[in-house]
Amino acid sequence: RQPSNSSTGELDMTALNFNENTYYVGFDANQGAELQGTMIRDYIEANIDTIDRNGDGIIGYVLAVGDIGHNDSIARTRGVRSALGTGVDADGSINSEPVGTNTDGSSSIVQDGTIEVNGQTYTVRELASQEMKNSAGATWDAATAGNAINTWSASFGDQIDVVVSNNDGMGMSMFNAWSKDNSVPTFGYDANSDAVAAIAEGYGGTISQHADVQAYLTLRVLRNALDGVDIDTGIGTPDEAGNVLSSDVFTYNADERSYYALNVAVTADNYQDFLDSTVVYAPVSN
């Protein structure tokens, strides 16, 4: 976890500046969140002729929120709402609170968005969302998400056109409990192996955090520090063997002393490239 204030998300620069060899390696949470939202919007636009299950002109979605206080969960909820136009500003940022139930579009936490395709305008509405916390207090709970989709589907029926989740664990629980049998696209995050495989069965898509690039960055930063060479060696600058990462798979923020792997949308167009997690990442395999 990146050193930061758990309430505000402000980075702990004292920790990140501990010494000259201190760096953080992770993934760009905001870029991934935006990408998930864009992936969902693109899917809706590409499938607009069939996605509105009851033909009411409203593209209704439900949202499984992992943990209302977790930075990644907050970012992903905001990313979806931003892309779909359902976000409402709260103190300078999109409100990430769960809406509860909003079938009539009257909530003050979200608003109705719009999507225009082929000259026709459709309303986009967050029908319901909740934090998936179980009775023991565990968040990101898959079983709770499975129960939630059964409750939502019983109440909203064919108003639900899209299912969205902050991660694949909850997403796959909802997919297996209801979405798959009802041909409702479900979108998650993490590119878990079961979710990637499920794309062939109708799972809408997921986001890969480029774990291979994260692993390489971590090992490379350590290696460079131990070898006493420039920290960028084999990362943005080729090493003696020619290993180097391209700028479309990582970014470095000098002010934050942080390397971030860039996320990738995994959809029906490319999921086969992600089925085997043991494949060596070729650009840095020399």
Language-model regions: role of each:
Residues 19-21, 58-60, 86-91, 122-127, ...:
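Loop/turn elements at helix/coil->beta-strand transitions in domains of secreted/extracellular proteins
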Residues 1-13, 184-190:
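Short beta-strand elements of ligand-binding domains
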Residues 9-11, 17, 23-56, 75, ...:
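Hydrophobic alpha-helical segments within soluble ligand-binding/sensing domains
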Residues 57-60, 64-68, 72, 84, ...:
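Hinge/cleft segment of the Venus flytrap/periplasmic-binding protein
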Residues 27-37, 55-144, 215:
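Extracytoplasmic ligand-binding site segments that recognize negatively charged/polar headgroups
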Residues 39-50, 54, 82-90, 148-155, ...:
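Structured segments of extracytoplasmic/periplasmic soluble domains
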